[in-house]
């Protein structure tokens, strides 16, 4: 089954796609937050995605803060547009730090450009490793 991972941000949303059986993850790019629901719906329909994994930004202690509420509001919009697609919230603590580690050595502009999609790939890698 194809799986799409989403790293939601207030400006940009990182996307990655993968396969549950093959455990392969590929970057799908970034979209603006304003266009994210529409673009995700297009990808789900075009690529026959069966699950969407959305990173939930918990605090280091595991609690939900203001950013988690924004993500949950976004997920509700996704669920309205994709009623037949399973949408899973996934603990994304430390994914940005790991993404920045992977991007070490790149110019700051390139890091900013790639951070969200790399974070989405990490979310998907973690999910696929758990199933």
Curated annotation (Swiss-Prot):
InterPro entries registered for this protein in UniProt: RNaseH-like_sf (IPR012337), YqgF (IPR005227), YqgF/RNaseH-like_dom (IPR006641), YqgF/RNaseH-like_dom_sf (IPR037027)
HAMAP family tied to this protein: Nuclease_YqgF
Gene Ontology MF terms in the entry: nuclease activity
UniProt keyword Nuclease, yes or no: yes
Name assigned to this protein: Putative pre-16S rRNA nuclease
E.C. number: 3.1.-.-
Role, per record: Could be a nuclease involved in processing of the 5'-end of pre-16S rRNA.
Primary residence: cytoplasm
């Amino acid at each position: 089954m194809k799986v799409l991972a989403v790293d939601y941000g207030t400006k940009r949303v990182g996307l990655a796609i993968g396969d549950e059986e093959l455990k392969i993850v590929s970057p799908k790019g970034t979209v603006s937050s304003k266009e994210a629901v529409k673009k995700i719906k297009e990808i789900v329909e075009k690529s026959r995605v069966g699950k969407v994994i959305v990173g939930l930004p918990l605090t280091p202690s595991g609690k939900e803060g203001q950013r988690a509420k924004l993500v949950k509001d976004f997920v509700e919009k996704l669920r309205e547009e994709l009623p037949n697609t399973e949408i899973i919230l996934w603990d994304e603590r430390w994914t940005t730090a790991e993404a920045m580690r992977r991007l070490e050595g790149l110019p700051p502009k390139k890091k900013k450009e790639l951070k969200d999609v790399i974070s989405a790939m990490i979310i998907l890698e973690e999910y696929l490793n758990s199933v």
